[in-house]
Curated annotation (Swiss-Prot):
Family: Belongs to the adaptor complexes medium subunit family. Delta-COP subfamily.
Keywords per UniProt: Acetylation, Cytoplasm, Cytoplasmic vesicle, ER-Golgi transport, Golgi apparatus, Membrane, Phosphoprotein, Protein transport, Transport
The name this protein goes by in its record: Coatomer subunit delta
Record's subcellular location: Cytoplasm; Golgi apparatus membrane; Cytoplasmic vesicle, COPI-coated vesicle membrane
The keyword Phosphoprotein belongs to this UniProt entry's keyword annotation: yes
GO cellular component: COPI vesicle coat; COPI-coated vesicle; endoplasmic reticulum; Golgi apparatus; Golgi membrane
Protein's gene: Arcn1
Main location: cytoplasm
Lineage summary: Eukaryota, Metazoa, Chordata, Craniata, Vertebrata
Length: 511
């Protein structure tokens, strides 16, 4: 079966929405659809008509027609089955089978049509799978949002660091007896402002104050006093900004985190004419007392070719996975070639991969309850004390080859009890009083920084601190499946290519 186009048109042959699966001009498809009503014989009950070059397979839908245009040598039974699936898809997105309703949801219909047919061939999907695929979240959008949030957090942390340095300089100056004008903003007016905005307070807690050598005594002059006053006003401006955000952030050097754990953003990838995106998403659920309830990982290699001269290529895949993942190639990929030689190529070597579109050529899946497969273990130990609970949380990286970036461990807190009292911490934390959560932020977890802990105290019960949720991003994939080489079908000559790898969290919970 070779499907040329799928369209919804009026009884006069006017195209409302049309999706072509082969290269075809707009004039050509409009001409084919305009000729369609003239070919129908109202006296017969057939659901297809033929011309010298194409076959129309159609189904009436009130005042409209669902039409498939195929080659004449296609299988009519498969065509009719595909037509039924197309006809069932349209009511999923359109409340009424009318022209204006179809036009309003035309892009939704085109996306659904693309899930049914790829490269002119029917995909093995049903209606439920089409609905799932079209509603699926965008990995690229998640990565973009995560990177942007990280940059915002880093900017806020830098602002707080500068504010603390200015406050420390002010205290050192006061110890030397050089209190300058301009610091009155930290007096009663600042306190009253804080009480007015009690619902959105911002506090900077210093559990380990840096030891700053006192400045040498110098004669105090008018110019020095003016400079100190200007610095005090700058401190006031920082504190006013902090008080408007409703968060609590603290940086501590009590743990193992040092300056080498600071995240360095990788430069943008230089995309070659052949570009691969390797994406993995993990869903994991653990019990608070230990034991992996379920872990499921989905991965895919997406191929994008931007130059048609590299359309006929083969990908050399290196699979070093030892966890037992299940691999599945695209229906148009030669499965025997992949099984025998780990090469990804089309069944028909004379055909080319699509140009300027992302094509999923290989996907894999891993599902397990084996605890040794957990990439990052989280242990949360709340113990009741006289004034509430002392909570100790530990993390440990079990996969030494991974490097996890922008790790955020979110712990729920009881409502109405105020901010937690932080003891020891590796990394940074943020208290969100509006959502009643404590976020433990770690820029990097790798083999050099594979374990750490957080201790805090707060009124509450042990059950108040679950479920614990984890999120992270990694530029190394979990299953160790890579494309090592790309060659042309003719001549087996190597082709330059680029690779982009992303390992994301879909859901990561400790219940």
């Amino acid at each position: 079966m070779v499907l040329l186009a799928a369209a919804v048109c009026t009884k006069a042959g006017k195209a409302i929405v049309s999706r072509q699966f082969v290269e075809m001009t707009r004039t050509r498809i409009e001409g084919l659809l305009a000729a369609f009503p003239k070919l129908m014989n109202t006296g017969k009950q057939h659901t297809f008509v033929e011309t010298e070059s194409v076959r129309y397979v159609y189904q009436p839908m009130e005042k409209l027609y669902m039409v498939l245009i195929t080659t004449k040598n296609s299988n009519i039974l498969e065509d009719l089955e595909t037509l039924r699936l197309f006809s069932r898809v349209i009511p999923e997105y359109c409340r009424a089978l009318e022209e204006n309703e179809i036009s309003e949801h035309c892009f939704d219909l085109i996306f659904a049509f693309d899930e049914i047919v790829a490269l002119g061939y029917r995909e093995n999907v049903n209606l439920a799978q089409i609905r799932t695929f079209t509603e699926m979240d965008s990995h690229e959008e998640k990565v973009f949002r995560a990177v942007r949030e990280t940059q915002e957090r880093e900017a806020k942390a830098e602002m707080r660091r500068k504010a603390k340095e200015l406050q420390q300089a002010r205290r050192d100056a006061e110890r030397q007896g050089k209190k300058a004008p301009g610091f009155g903003g930290f007096g009663s007016s600042a306190v009253s402002g804080g009480s007015t905005a009690a619902m959105i307070t911002e506090t900077i807690i210093e559990t380990d104050k840096p030891k700053v050598a006192p400045a040498p005594a110098r004669p105090s002059g008018p110019s020095k006093a003016l400079k100190l006053g200007a610095k005090g006003k700058e401190v006031d401006n920082f504190v006013d900004k902090l008080k408007s955000e409703g968060e609590t952030i603290m940086s501590s050097n009590m743990g193992k985190r040092t300056s080498e754990a600071t995240k360095v953003h990788a430069p943008p990838i230089n995309m070659e004419s052949v570009h691969m995106k390797i994406e993995e998403k993990i869903t994991l659920t653990c019990g608070r007392d230990g034991g992996l309830q379920n872990m499921e990982l989905h991965g895919m290699i997406m191929l994008r070719i931007s130059d048609d001269k590299f359309g006929r290529i083969r990908l050399h895949v290196e699979n070093e996975d030892k966890k037992g993942v299940q691999l599945q190639t695209h229906p148009n990929v030669d499965k025997k070639l992949f099984t025998a030689e780990s090469l990804i190529g089309l069944k028909n070597p004379e055909k080319s991969f699509p140009v300027n579109s992302d094509v999923g050529v290989l996907k894999w899946r891993l599902q397990t309850t084996e605890e040794s497969f957990i990439p990052l273990t989280i242990n949360c130990w709340p113990s009741e004390s006289g004034n509430g609970c002392d909570v100790n949380i530990e993390y440990e990286l079990q996969e030494d080859n991974l490097e996890l970036n922008d790790v955020v461990i979110t712990i729920p807190l009881p409502s109405g009890v105020g901010a937690p009292v932080i003891g020891e911490i590796d990394g940074e934390y943020r208290h969100d009083s509006r959502r009643n959560t404590l976020e433990w932020c770690l820029p990097v977890i790798d083999a050099k920084n594979k374990s750490g802990s957080l201790e805090f105290s707060i009124p509450g019960q042990p059950n108040d601190f679950f479920p614990v949720q984890v999120s992270f991003i990694s530029k190394k994939n979990y299953c160790n499946i890579q494309v090592t080489k790309v060659t042309q079908v003719d001549g087996n000559s190597p082709v330059r290519f680029s690779t982009e790898t992303t390992f994301l969290v879909d859901k990561y919970e400790i219940l």
